[in-house]
């Protein structure tokens, strides 16, 4: 069934102990994700976009996913609670999420890509975010597995331990024009300040959110989120900094027959009433971070324990990570050296293979060493070379290199480009011959069997960018990119009928049996362009366009597109600060028709093109109250 388009009305009210809202002065943006240390964005050896705190406040975004819609090369797939994020034609599982440089790795508790969008619910509330850095293209040489498509690093506000306590409270409501669509209500809060002046500080964050269930079959389910976090910051001296973090997030997703879920399921002439579906996801993280800033040497180390629970499917994962990264400043060279150790454990009572004799736990260790050198060969040209070695318990050793150059041709022109390798290790279930994962969507009795002979997926990407900035009120850029993808892990049907002897495993006959294999090669390529114009002191216009295409180079569907991506994407936004207290904004997001795509074992049809237009305003009622409203 086609879900009708809807028009949204959003009202947000925020209160904070802060200075009056004004546009920040133009200044060089500083980023850290491309190299691990601070540098100006025009010098960063990567294609990188930044969503600043000011932009987040101006546009009344609902969450991180909403903010990412305006970034070139980024596609937000799905909708409602099931939004997922893809970069440069790579599927969402190849996008690595970081929070303050630390991994968010939870996909093992939603196998077969069920309930997509879960990872976005683990990200910090907008009130606590300082900026969001988005790297388009592989960064496996620095961050390892999963960073094949790109990296999204959410950087939160620093703890204040020398100033008075400050905070903000933000509440918003979204009312649907179509009364059959669920309304959205959300509140998030942030506070930070000293516990012991100059020595110990703290910050706390919280989020409450609910999206009501649609009264439309195959519409959006009900989603409820409750998030909370606390950070203690200890600064014994000006050179050392310690953070102790704890965060706990809960998500509930509910579907009711006759509302977002069909009242019954029919197989042939037999129909069975559906039951209500209730899913809960729980995520808890603990981490300890040390940062040291010395004369010619900086260091950052952290240890993190991440626990994710899917109680409805009796799945629980544990990811323990220790990471160390150091920068050594040697004249024209900035040397980055580091290492990482990860231990993954998955408990899942859903193993379907009787021959596995009750196997319900999978584990894996891996460690890595990495090095990069940023060499300022001349005043205008910098070359960055990096290499990472990953050692995996199941897959041995993998080497991931990258090389990138930044050339400031003239005062207003910059040429950037490089070659980067990408790497992604198979999931725990995918690599175990003793694991059979249930599948079939509740309509068919199917199973996917793991394969210990799988190889890691790999990619090789090239990009070339030309950027122009008149250092006043105009900027523009164009980037060409190409990615060759090999050893893609895909699902191949062993049999398709319970009458087929091949579909009988351990005395049980399945409707179908699938195997995991490395078969596919693919290519993704495209163009990203951007333009910005500060028309007057109070009026600003930005626009970007992305062209992306993909092609499978081998396998049954050679010559067909790989992923469900629009070839054409266009985003534009106009901001007007009418008075010191009143501002208006508008944005347009156009997505072309998506190509047909490989959906597990067959090609599926794409979706039609669409255009979204949003307009809004912001009003500073007083120094502590900001009111925003919009029509989406």
Residue ranges and their predicted role:
Residues 2-12, 192-194, 207, 233-235, ...:
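Conserved C-terminal beta-signal and adjacent last beta-strands/turns
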Residues 64-67, 83-86, 97-100, 119-122, ...:
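N-terminal periplasmic accessory domains that precede
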Residues 103, 108, 263-266, 345-347, ...:
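Surface-exposed extracellular loop regions of Gram-negative outer-membrane beta-barrel proteins
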Residues 103-136:
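Short acidic/polar hinge/loop motifs at secondary-structure boundaries
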Residues 161-279, 487:
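Periplasmic-side early beta-strands and strand-to-turn transitions of outer-membrane beta-barrels
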Residues 168-170, 376-380, 481-484, 504-599:
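Gram-negative outer-membrane beta-barrel transporters
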Residues 233-251, 274-398, 402-410, 474-481, ...:
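Face-selective signature of the C-terminal outer-membrane beta-barrel domain
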Residues 321-325, 338, 362, 368-370, ...:
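Outer membrane beta-barrel strand-and-loop segments of large Gram-negative receptors
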């Amino acid at each position: 069934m086609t879900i009708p388009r809807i028009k949204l009305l959003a009202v947000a009210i925020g209160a904070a102990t802060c200075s009056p809202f004004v546009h920040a002065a133009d200044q060089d943006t500083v980023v850290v994700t491309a190299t691990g240390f601070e540098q100006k964005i025009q010098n960063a050896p990567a294609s990188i976009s930044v969503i600043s705190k000011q932009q987040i406040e101006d546009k009344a975004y609902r969450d991180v996913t909403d903010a990412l819609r305006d970034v070139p090369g980024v596609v937000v797939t799905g909708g409602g609670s099931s939004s997922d994020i893809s970069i440069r034609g790579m599927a969402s599982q190849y996008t690595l999420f970081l929070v303050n440089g630390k991994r968010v790795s939870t996909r093992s508790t939603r196998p077969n890509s069920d309930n997509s969008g879960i990872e976005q619910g683990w990200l910090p509330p907008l009130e606590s975010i300082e900026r969001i850095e988005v790297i388009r293209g592989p960064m496996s040489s620095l961050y390892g597995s999963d960073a094949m498509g790109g990296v999204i690093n959410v950087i939160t506000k620093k703890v204040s331990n020398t100033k008075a306590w400050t905070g903000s409270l933000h509440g918003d409501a979204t009312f649907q024009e179509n009364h059959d669509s669920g309304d959205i209500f959300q509140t998030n809060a942030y506070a930070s300040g000293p516990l012991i002046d100059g020595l110990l500080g703290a910050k706390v964050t919280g989020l409450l959110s609910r999206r009501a269930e649609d009264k439309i079959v195959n519409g959006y389910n009900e989603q409820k989120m409750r998030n909370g976090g606390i950070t203690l910051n200890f600064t014994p001296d000006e050179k050392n900094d310690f953070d102790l973090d704890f965060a706990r997030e809960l998500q509930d997703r509910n579907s009711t027959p006759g509302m977002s879920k069909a009242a019954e399921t029919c197989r042939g002439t037999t129909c069975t009433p559906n039951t209500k579906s209730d899913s809960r996801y729980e995520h808890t993280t603990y981490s300890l971070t040390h940062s040291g800033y010395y004369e010619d040497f900086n260091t950052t180390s952290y240890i993190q324990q991440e626990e994710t629970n899917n109680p409805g499917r009796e799945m629980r994962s544990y990811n323990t990570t220790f990471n160390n990264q150091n920068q050594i400043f040697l004249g024209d060279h900035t040397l980055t050296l580091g290492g990482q150790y990860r231990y993954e454990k998955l408990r899942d009572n859903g193993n379907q293979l009787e021959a596995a004799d009750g196997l319900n736990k999978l584990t894996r260790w891996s460690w890595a060493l990495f090095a990069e050198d940023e060499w300022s060969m001349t005043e205008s040209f910098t070359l960055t070379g990096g290499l990472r070695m990953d050692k995996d318990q199941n897959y041995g050793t993998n080497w991931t290199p990258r090389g990138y150059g930044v050339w400031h041709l003239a005062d207003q022109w910059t040429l950037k480009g490089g070659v980067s390798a990408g790497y992604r290790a198979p999931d725990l279930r995918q690599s175990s011959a003793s694991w059979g994962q249930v599948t079939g969507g509740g309509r068919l009795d199917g199973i996917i069997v793991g394969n210990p002979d799988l190889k890691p997926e790999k990619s090789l990407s090239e990009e070339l960018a030309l950027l122009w900035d008149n250092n006043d009120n105009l900027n523009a850029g164009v980037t060409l990119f190409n990615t060759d993808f090999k050893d893609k892990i895909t699902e191949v049907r062993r049999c398709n009928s319970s009458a087929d002897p091949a579909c009988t495993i351990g005395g049980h006959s399945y409707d179908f049996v699938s195997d995991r294999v490395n078969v596919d090669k693919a290519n993704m390529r495209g163009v990203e362009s951007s333009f910005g114009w500060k028309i007057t002191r109070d009026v600003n216009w930005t626009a970007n366009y992305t062209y992306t295409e993909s092609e499978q180079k081998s396998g049954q569907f050679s010559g067909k597109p790989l992923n469900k991506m629009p070839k054409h994407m266009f985003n534009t936004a106009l901001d007007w600060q009418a008075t010191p207290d009143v501002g208006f904004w508008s944005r347009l997001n156009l997505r072309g028709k998506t190509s047909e795509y490989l959906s597990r074992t067959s090609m599926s049809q794409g979706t039609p093109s669409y255009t979204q237009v949003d307009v809004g305003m912001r009003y500073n009622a007083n120094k502590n109250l900001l009111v925003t409203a919009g029509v989406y």
